[in-house]
């Protein structure tokens, strides 16, 4: 796993996002958990944002196509958003195995408010109280990227690349010192 680590030292608040290719295998999840442990052991606060496992969203889209030629956009958002929830839970299990307190959060629980453009929603604002509460309890919030909720309570997805957008928006809202976008790559060009 490649993750550019900053040289900032002094109890930084870091938002770190892991993409789908980084959360596909158990050894990757364990590596992410160990990196998170190192981060908090040096005194930093950490928010993790995760994508669905590589190929998972496409698989869920194919599942919908098996039963309908024209599913509603809101139903599709409910279906394809579950991949991120699975990644959050899997990572939480790995962190808990290392004795690291954490709490998983859907986009809704994280307070990510969007417009109603299902399948390609835009973040309007973030109500970060729950993320701040978890950080204040010295836990790692693990936020499902790609998800949000309308002001009417309807689940939305942000479209491809939405987990990156989620991480940057959370970092901005929390005035984080660092926002890291991590991936599983052979090298950096």
Predicted regions, residues:
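Nucleotide/pyrophosphate-binding catalytic subdomain
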Residues: 5-189
């Amino acid at each position: 796993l490649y993750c550019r680590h900053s040289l900032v030292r002094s109890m930084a608040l870091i938002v770190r996002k892991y993409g789908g290719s980084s959360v596909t295998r158990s050894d990757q999840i364990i590596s992410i958990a160990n990196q998170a442990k190192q981060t908090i052991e040096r005194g930093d606060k950490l928010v993790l944002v995760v994508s669905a496992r590589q190929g998972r969203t496409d698989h869920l889209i194919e599942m919908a196509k098996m039963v309908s030629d024209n599913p509603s956009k809101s139903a599709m958002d409910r279906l394809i958003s579950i991949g991120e929830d699975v990644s959050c839970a899997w990572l939480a299990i790995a962190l808990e195995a290392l004795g690291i307190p954490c709490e998983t959060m859907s986009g809704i629980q994280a307070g990510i408010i969007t417009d109603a453009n299902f399948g390609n929603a835009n973040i309007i604002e973030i109500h970060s109280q729950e993320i701040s509460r978890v950080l204040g309890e010295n836990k790692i919030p693990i936020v499902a990227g790609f998800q949000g909720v309308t002001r009417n309570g309807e689940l939305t997805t942000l479209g491809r690349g939405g987990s990156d957008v989620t991480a940057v928006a959370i970092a901005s809202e929390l005035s984080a010192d660092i926002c890291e976008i991590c991936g599983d790559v052979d090298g950096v060009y």
